[in-house]
Amino acid sequence: SNFLFTEDFTGTVFYPAMQGKEVIKEDEEEVWVRIGAGVEWDDFVAWTVQQGWGGVENLSFIPGHVGAAPVQNVGAYGIEAGERIGRVEAIDLDKAIRVEIAGKDCRFAYRDSIFKREWKNRYIITRVVFRLSKKPEFRLDYGALRSELEKMGGEVNLTNIRQAVIRIRRSKLPDVAEIPNAGSFFKNPVVSREQADRL
């Protein structure tokens, strides 16, 4: 969802700018929220933390928009967006119709989804529905995150986890207001057991 051009581009860029955040279903344990594809990803994460809903707090301060999250299956610090996506709403360009695609049908994998493969260029994502927890269970498997939380002191909660992630990210990346960037993007190599043993 973030473009960094190295030269002039003469084609057409379609930018889905759908806004909006709404609760569509909730019970004692969970809340389902429908978010416009054009909502800034970090604005969405900040909103969930303010509401006290867990599930995406480790994904704080990632640049981009909500509509790109299902394509890349964005992830950080032990959490991937696909774990929390209940469905994706989109326009099927082949059939010129609106569709709803269940999260389980998106074939989420490590930094991957069906939108990058079989369905590449077929759908325009308009909204994403996330399933969030009202009783969050924190993921603190990453040493850097645990260490930052310890340095900060205080209790482990959604707000402090978000702040710890932001502090870590700010220490690694330049301020986008000063040096425009698309954040960090990389994919850890996936190797066979045999290759890992050799290494």
Regions found by a protein language model. Give the residues of each.
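Phosphate/pyrophosphate- and phosphate-bearing ligand-binding catalytic cores of soluble enzymes
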Residues: 98-199
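Anion-binding (especially nucleotide phosphate/pyrophosphate-binding) glycine-rich loop
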Residues: 1-94
